């Protein structure tokens, strides 16, 4: 047996019905599209049209809204600040502000439009006494910084 001698068993694979190949084929002339009209033309798909029944987009109610006063935060963790201190990108002696975090590449903050919030995920201890001036802090992050002798400005 060779690769070029392989074939499917008879009846294992049925040929697809080829439409619009003459009236003797059983699916000829209009090819199952009916006569004239928008749906008989090529490239048509009426988006959202469900044949006259009320479309789902109209059946379902409007829900929710976009609050314009929602505050969007850049989230950073205490370990991000620890890494920047270890690398020398931040100094423990300075007041750590949003601008210094952007300079140290801890926060990616284009035009300083977003607020910065400090979390304490994966951090149970924090040694350096830092003075931070950020927009928001989680309660656990506040406790860790104050326990280490730091200040929140």
UniProtKB/Swiss-Prot annotation:
- Name the segments for region: Disordered: 21-41
Question: Which Gene Ontology terms cover its molecular function?
Answer: rRNA binding; structural constituent of ribosome
Q: Name one GO biological process term.
A: translation
Gly residues bias spans: 23-35
SUPFAM superfamilies reported in the protein's UniProt record: Ribosomal proteins L15p and L18e
Q: How does it assemble?
A: Part of the 50S ribosomal subunit.
Family under the similarity heading: Belongs to the universal ribosomal protein uL15 family.
Role: Binds to the 23S rRNA.
The record's listing under HAMAP family reads:
Ribosomal_uL15 (MF_01341)
- Kindly provide the name given to this protein in its UniProt entry: Large ribosomal subunit protein uL15
């Amino acid at each position: 047996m060779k690769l070029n001698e392989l074939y499917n068993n008879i009846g294992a694979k049925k040929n697809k019905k080829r439409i619009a190949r003459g009236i003797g084929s059983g699916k000829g002339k209009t090819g199952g599209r009916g006569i004239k009209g928008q749906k008989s033309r090529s490239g048509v798909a009426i988006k959202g049209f469900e044949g006259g029944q009320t479309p789902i987009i109209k059946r379902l109610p409007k829900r929710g809204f976009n609050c314009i006063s929602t505050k969007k935060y850049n989230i950073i963790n205490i370990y991000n600040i620890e890494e920047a201190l270890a690398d020398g990108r931040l100094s423990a002696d300075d007041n750590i502000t949003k601008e210094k975090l952007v300079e140290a590449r801890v926060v990616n903050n284009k035009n300083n439009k977003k607020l910065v919030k400090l979390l304490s995920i994966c951090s149970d201890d924090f040694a350096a006494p830092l003075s931070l001036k950020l927009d928001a802090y989680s309660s656990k992050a506040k406790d860790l910084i104050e326990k280490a002798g730091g200040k929140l400005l």
